[in-house]
């Protein structure tokens, strides 16, 4: 070895030692950061606490009834949760407004949006009911202003309506005028130094549950495909977690608070299975169920409806990476007895009540039984469905109507007398029928009626039982093939078999008349006429008139117009 090579050798040794020393001081892995998210879905403008049933082993029948929800309670819950984490993110999964009780609906749902703004909602996926009054009216509710197709309701609660105060998201709702999404597809919220991406979507089949007018200028694309397309873009922005917020749902027989429930079924399951693995959690809505289920490795949640539950999620997020090491979820019951009311929300609720009661408390009529519920028997018939169909048949009598049909999804509550009162009031009746759909009369042939009834059973397994009016009846068999479950020859009107080639005059609401809920046979009706009366007005008139005649209507039990043989 030459004297020139020795210094080089010593230098190399020194560098190696330094490198080894450096290994001893490698930075430890970054600790996960807890990001808290609180979600509600399907609030539907319920400003007040309202009836909810929960499983309770201590109750005589295993079910406890209470009043849950209401903006005062929801606000109180958020106040308490924010004491633990002031940076929690409050979000929605659609149908926050629309299909609302009159306390909110008579003011174009502006009090509900005002409440959510005060509660600092960060974002929401759009639901189908946000589109009840069409694209332009939804955009007004989003952005503010008073130019509305509901001039007697918009800007009546406040002279100036500033907008929702939070963005709606939809990756799959396309404005046909531009070919682009009507709304931002996603939003990134930065909390505790972490980037959390929320991607919104509405159910692909939204056109089947929104009126044709409501969907004008809009179309939808597949939920999962629309979300998956955005994953590379989100990753380029360095997000630490991706949350899908989809207004589509499912159901399970398991309790709303069961961890990692495993029996979830319905449309949301297919969406969940097809989502990119980069999606960390799926917050759902639409089906009005509470669950915390797993679909494969993906957690899928929903918080019932009407403000009854709040879904709380804690994501353990790894700084500097898109990596979630843990997710904990709970569905919290919005029990007014457990959470002190938020003073600001309580004041808003009382203001709305005080300004609405002169209309809402107006007596309508007596009923022959209380409650009259929308709970279906095994055949799919409900006591309240019977009553509403009878009211619509009475409204169509002058137009020759022989049969009325009512969709169960349009019946939004039960009818029950308040303690000490003998008559229902306007607010109670309007809560049950909030959509103000015009009634339409038209003709279908007898053979078309049977085809129509067979459309109640959907390919995915749902049974959307139409409610039928007095004098109309049929029988069905669950063991018969899809598309032919109505027993041939069992469809009768006033005790006589319906004749295949004879025309029969029907009356239905405008939503059904346009083929809503995928009842396409209604669109084949001929000799159409607009009754120029709404479903709500027909029910109010029927209740009032029968009460005045001393013949109050309604029953606690279904009338047996629909019979399931097996």
Where are these regions (language model features)?
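Bacterial N-terminal signal peptides that target proteins for export
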Residues: 2-11
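Extreme N-terminus of proteins, especially the signal/transit-peptide cleavage junction
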Residues: 3, 26-33, 356, 360
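Acidic, metal/ion-coordinating pockets
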Residues: 24-338, 379, 383-394, 404, ...
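Feature captures C-terminal
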Residues: 33-36, 46, 156-186, 294-298, ...
């Amino acid at each position: 070895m030459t004297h020139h090579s020795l210094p080089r050798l010593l230098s190399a040794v020194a560098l190696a030692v330094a490198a080894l020393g450096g290994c001893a001081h490698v930075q430890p892995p970054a600790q996960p950061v807890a990001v808290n998210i609180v979600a509600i879905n399907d609030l539907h403008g319920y400003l007040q606490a309202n009836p909810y049933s929960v499983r309770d082993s201590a109750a005589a029948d295993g079910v406890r009834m209470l009043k849950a929800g209401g903006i005062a309670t929801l606000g109180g819950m958020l106040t308490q949760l924010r004491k633990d984490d002031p940076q929690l993110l409050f979000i929605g999964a659609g149908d926050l407004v629309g299909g609302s009780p009159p306390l909110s609906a008579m003011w174009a749902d502006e009090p509900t949006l005002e409440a959510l703004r005060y509660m600092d909602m960060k974002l929401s996926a759009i639901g189908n009911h946000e589109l009840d009054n069409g694209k332009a009216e939804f955009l007004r509710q989003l952005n503010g202003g008073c130019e509305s197709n509901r001039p007697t309701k918009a800007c009546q609660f406040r002279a100036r309506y500033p907008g929702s105060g939070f963005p709606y998201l939809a990756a799959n709702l396309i404005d046909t005028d531009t070919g682009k999404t009507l709304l931002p597809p996603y939003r990134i919220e930065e909390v505790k130094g972490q980037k959390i991406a929320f991607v919104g979507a509405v159910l692909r089949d939204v056109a089947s549950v929104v009126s044709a007018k409501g969907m004008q200028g809009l179309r939808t694309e597949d939920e999962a495909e629309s979300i998956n397309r955005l994953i590379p873009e989100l990753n380029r922005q360095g997000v630490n977690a991706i949350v899908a917020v989809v207004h589509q749902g499912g159901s399970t027989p398991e309790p709303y608070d069961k961890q990692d429930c495993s029996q979830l079924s319905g449309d949301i399951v297919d969406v969940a299975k097809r989502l990119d693995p980069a999606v960390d959690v799926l917050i759902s809505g639409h089906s009005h169920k509470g669950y915390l289920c797993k679909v494969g490795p993906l957690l899928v949640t929903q918080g019932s409806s009407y403000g009854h539950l709040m879904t709380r999620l804690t994501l353990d997020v790894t700084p500097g990476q898109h990596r979630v090491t843990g997710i904990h979820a709970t569905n919290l019951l919005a029990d007014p007895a457990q959470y002190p009311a938020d003073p600001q929300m309580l004041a808003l609720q009382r203001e709305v009540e005080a300004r609405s009661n002169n209309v809402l408390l107006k007596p309508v009529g007596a009923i022959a039984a209380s409650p009259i519920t929308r709970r279906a028997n095994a055949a799919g018939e409900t006591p309240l469905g019977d009553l509403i169909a009878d009211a619509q048949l009475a409204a169509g009598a002058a137009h020759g109507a022989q049969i009325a049909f009512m969709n169960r999804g349009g019946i939004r509550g039960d009818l029950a007398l308040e303690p000490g009162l003998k008559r229902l009031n306007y607010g109670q009746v309007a809560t049950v029928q909030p959509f103000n759909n015009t009634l339409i009369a038209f003709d279908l042939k007898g053979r078309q009626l049977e085809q129509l009834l067979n459309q109640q059973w959907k390919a995915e397994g749902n049974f959307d039982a139409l409610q039928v009016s007095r004098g109309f009846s049929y029988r069905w068999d669950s063991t018969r093939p899809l598309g032919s479950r109505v027993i041939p020859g069992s469809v009768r009107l006033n005790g006589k078999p319906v004749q295949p080639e004879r025309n029969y005059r029907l009356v239905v609401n405008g939503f059904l008349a346009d083929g809503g809920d995928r009842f396409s046979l209604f669109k084949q009706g001929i000799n159409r006429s607009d009754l120029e009366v709404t479903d709500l007005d027909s029910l109010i008139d029927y209740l009032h008139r029968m009460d005045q005649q001393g013949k109050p209507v309604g029953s606690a039990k279904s009338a047996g117009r629909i019979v399931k043989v097996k």
